[in-house]
Amino acid sequence: QKDMLKLLFKAADLMNDIFWVENVEAKDAFMLGINNEKDRQYALINYGPWDEMNNLAPFIKGYGDKPAGAQFYPENMTVEEFDKFENPNKTSQYTLIRRNNKTRELEIVWYHEGFKEKTKAAAELLLEASKLAEDPGFATYLKLRAQALLIDDYFASDIAWLDMKNNLIDFVVGPIENYTDKLFGYKTAHEAYILIKDVEWSNKLTMYAKYLPQLQKELPVDAAYKMETPGSDVELNAYDVIFYAGDCNMAGKTIAINLPNDEQVQLEKGT
């Protein structure tokens, strides 16, 4: 399992690299322009020149306000231009909006194409790690997640992730949350967590998980707000996070997750 973890760390580092590009630009290119050591250290924490803990105030000379859409969209794109852009995949959480070099018109680029080198390398690492996984469910998840990174379809891997019951090591990886896209909230950013399950506390939480469907029914709100019934295969677990990468590591650390975000997965299986 130690050899497997080494591969997961490498895959997580690739999510770090991708998130830098999504948030500001490639890390090495960005850091070259910063000479002050304190600024360099704080930029590493914030994945860029904007203070995430202080209303995105720029702390490095030469930078203005952070683009609302980060680097998911062209900085000179207007909302009106986006609205007129006729492409069914423009609102996909797994596409970048770019400008065609020749026509200057908007076009979409799927994540697996825009970050081809990194996603392919991460997928290969996950496949290699799956061969070392002791838990069969975790091995299946890693294989499906590797495929998902290459095609931008995460449904099967999300289901496999929820099906895991006995794995002590967990790995959350890929484009997941949309908080960095403050323009429309469409685009999800890359991140990774490596976690070790706290078995004792997870067992204590099991009793609460089984009551969640009933608790939803008893919420003091109109029935109209309770029409969707989530899947009953819900889990509550406690983990020690041993590594954060990408979006979840920017400025503060994410300390709780409720995944997957896919509503269809939630209805079929839960979270």
Give the location of each predicted region.
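N-terminal helix-rich structural modules
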Residues: 1-141
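Fold-level signature of zinc-dependent metallopeptidase catalytic domains
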Residues: 3-7, 85-271
